[in-house]
Amino acid sequence: MFDDALPADMAVESGDPREPSVPLFPEELALVASAVEKRQLEFGRGRQCARAALRRLGFADRPLLSGDQREPLWPVGVVGSITHTQGLCVAAVGQQRDYAGVGIDVEPSAPLPRAVADRVASEAEMSALDSMPPLLAARLIFSAKEAFYKCQFYRTRQFLGFFDVSLELEAEGEFAVHLLVDAGPLLRGDRFRGRWRQRNGFLFSAIVMPSEHRR
């Protein structure tokens, strides 16, 4: 559904968590044994999408466990990201020789509550998106920043606040993230490009960080 938001050499798979899915590995089941049913369904479909994407890169099925920050632990040589919302899970993976990180986020294509919007988007960012309804623009800003935070975590192992970056739309379906603080090997002023799509009732954001030799 959103393959065109990511490079052609990355594998992207999506699915509906409400539909039946392939059983999880026992090690994965243990991670969500005490979770509510909705969380279990989203986790299961997300892992199923991730394995389907990995198969396209030539990797055999295996358990995908979680790190201490609940991030997926990918096979050696792989970068990836999983996202889900009501009615949709998406996974994207690529080769680590080509990419230093990838982050994706899917959201309902609906206005963000005002109280949340004020915590994730600056007035300048909102003004730059004046062609969209304000709270829908805030949803896009939230999604794009979430995608970047997942992507940069591969490099920095650091958490960033919503106002540690600024978002700028460059063209229809594209955006740029400007880093406003130093974060590990990433420096204040660094700029990263991403893409967003609005389809079938969803907003989707994606950003990749090329490996050093591809910069």
Residue map of PLM features:
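Core catalytic alpha/beta fold that binds nucleotide/phospho-ligands
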Residues: M1-R215
